[in-house]
């Protein structure tokens, strides 16, 4: 296997050639204790570019086939993913959004300028009713991100009442006037977003005091139990987490964390589709870097909360590349290659390992923005490689995490990051069925993987593989099926040992039978 990087055993940075090592592993099928919360497969929809308008929503009068204004093709694709939770309306947009502008007759709703994302004029035709009805159609939990940056305590408190009160209250009456008699069930409430940045440029001490105040007035109505989420840190800001844990403590049910696989926040972030192997391996290292970040935030939380009553939610994550040439600046429209699929699989593998504290993750974003599941253009829709990873991995939702030991080659890439050539995760569902997902990160070489299955009684395994001719391959409107799962048969089980021949740059999910 040829690498232009030093392995972890060597300090030199010259090119050299080595042979791919055999990969060995053991699944501890009887040691699973933690559930992989299905909310780790959460999604995120912001009023940004064409995520909402043209992506999820076209309006009931559109010629694009729709149900009550929601695109039929996108709806069905998302139902097939079993989306567990959807975060809305932002993102940075959330702290400029005033919910009362998005209720009542659509033709009477006031317009606003979306200052964070390209200055687009927002007509508010997609508001509270449209979002919560969408969640009902998808069968997912809504996650409301409240406006703390430019809003008021009263505004957010009234929004909670509007959505969740079934009583004879002013906001419940207003909701009924707008066509919804029965209150919705809204579990997740984010008290602000990125309050250290676009959500108000606050200090953690100041935000902590605001959270305490807001949380008092965001009440539980008629059996609805709010799960209140504090606006947490950006990647390496461990002090933010420490201050919040010290000052808020278990007044919050959870603290958020944002981590993007991005080269930096100034200058070019790199092309989504034009990159070399060195760029690819660096991206894998940056994606895997989220594990160290989670560990360090967890360690801070463990000191203040050893019983793990406060959860950690990675409610924004994914790749962030330069916008596609010819698209509107500030709309964050990017293509999605096999490289992005690996960022998804490696990240989900990490999330599974920390389910004792990590209870939700929301990839950014669901349609047409950043590392999206789906791209749309007028009447057309295309599913991305990332979509297929989420579809292949959905078998892990709410299953029991099974520890898996794996020994494989590792390489060092720039910025002192280390990348194992194989990543793996395993789970057992409520029926006792074991699923294993394997990612061969190696761009050039197949991997021969031998896994000890322990006491499992499996006789065979069936599964799917996601790969492509090139790492830069992607699905376009002209060629929508370049990167798509196919049946996988290169696996054999004999006397408790599974042997898998995993092609280069491939992702596989197996079911043991």
Show the residue positions of the predicted features:
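Gly/Pro-rich active-site loop or hairpin
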Residues: 284
């Amino acid at each position: 296997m040829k690498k232009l990087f030093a392995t972890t055993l060597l300090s030199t940075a010259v090119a050299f050639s080595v042979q791919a090592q055999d990969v060995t592993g053991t699944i501890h099928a009887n040691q699973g204790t933690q559930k992989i919360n299905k909310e780790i497969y959460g999604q995120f929809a912001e009023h940004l570019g064409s995520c909402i308008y043209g992506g999820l929503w076209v309006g009931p009068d559109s010629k694009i086939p729709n149900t009550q204004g929601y695109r039929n093709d996108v709806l069905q694709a998302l139902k097939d993913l079993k989306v567990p939770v959807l975060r809305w309306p932002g993102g940075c947009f959330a702290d400029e959004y005033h919910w009362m502008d998005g209720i009542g007759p659509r033709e009477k709703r006031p317009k606003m300028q979306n200052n964070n994302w390209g200055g687009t004029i927002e007509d508010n035709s997609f508001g509270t009713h449209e979002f919560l009805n969408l969640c009902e159609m998808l069968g997912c939990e809504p996650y409301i991100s409240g406006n703390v940056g430019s809003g008021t305590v009263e505004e957010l408190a009234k929004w909670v009442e509007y959505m969740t009160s079934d009583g004879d209250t002013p906001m419940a009456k207003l909701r009924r006037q707008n066509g919804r008699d029965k209150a919705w069930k809204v579990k997740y409430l984010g008290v602000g977003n990125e309050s250290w940045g676009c959500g108000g440029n606050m200090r953690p001490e100041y935000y902590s005091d605001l959270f305490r105040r807001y949380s008092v007035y965001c009440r539980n109505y008629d059996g609805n139990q709010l799960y209140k989420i504090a606006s947490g840190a950006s990647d390496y800001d461990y002090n933010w987490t420490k201050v919040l844990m010290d000052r808020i403590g278990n007044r919050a049910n959870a603290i958020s964390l944002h981590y993007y696989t991005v080269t930096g926040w100034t200058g070019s972030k790199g092309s989504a589709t034009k990159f070399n192997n060195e760029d690819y391996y660096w991206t894998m290292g940056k994606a895997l870097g989220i594990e160290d970040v989670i560990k360090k935030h967890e360690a801070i939380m463990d000191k203040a909360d050893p019983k793990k009553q406060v959860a950690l939610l990675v409610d924004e994550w994914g790749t962030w590349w330069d916008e596609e040439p010819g698209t509107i600046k500030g709309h964050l429209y990017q293509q999605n290659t096999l490289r992005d699929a690996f960022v998804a699989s490696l990240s989900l593998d990490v999330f599974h390992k920390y389910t004792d504290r990590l209870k939700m993750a929301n990839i950014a974003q669901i349609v047409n923005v950043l590392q999206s599941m789906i791209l749309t253009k007028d009447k057309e829709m295309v599913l991305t490689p990332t979509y297929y990873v989420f579809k292949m991995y959905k078998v892990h939702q709410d299953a029991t995490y099974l520890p898996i030991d794996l020994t494989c080659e590792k390489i060092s890439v720039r910025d002192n990051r280390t990348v194992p050539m194989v990543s793996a995760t395993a789970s057992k569902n409520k029926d006792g069925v074991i699923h294993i997902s394997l990612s061969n990160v190696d761009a050039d070489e197949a991997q021969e993987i031998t896994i000890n299955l322990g006491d499992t009684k499996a006789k065979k395994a069936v599964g799917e593989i996601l790969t492509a001719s090139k790492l830069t391959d992607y699905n376009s409107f002209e060629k929508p099926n370049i990167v798509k799962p196919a049946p996988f048969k290169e696996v054999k089980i004999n006397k408790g040992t599974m042997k898998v021949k995993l092609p280069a740059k491939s992702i596989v999910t197996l079911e043991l039978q």
